Amino acid sequence: MPEFSLGDINSKTASCIFPELYKLLEKRKEEAQVDHSYTASLMAKGLDAVLKKIGEESTEVVIAAKNLDHQEQVHEIADLCYHLLILMVYHNISLDDIHAELQRRLNVSGIEEKKSRAKN
């Protein structure tokens, strides 16, 4: 099996959609048109509503994975990503913040990374 390279990822599909979607969610937050936007209405309901939705979507991902249904998993993971982006916008956490954290972890074993969190 050939070694995986990050360069093999189609940059348009893998990296451009998240910034585009993030900007759209920021716009929905700013415009706050709760009658016309699901995202704006969810954010207007507050943090608990956003977190509840993330919990629901997380559970749906688990169920889809358990059912071994590829298309259902894709659908539910996309829903979860969308709602995580809503949370990020809600708390002003940028994609750059997440990128920096993942980059920091890239060459660190999971065991070492968890140990470093315990010290903080």
Language-model segments: residues:
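Flexible "arm" and connector segments at domain edges
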Residues: M1-I77, C81-N120
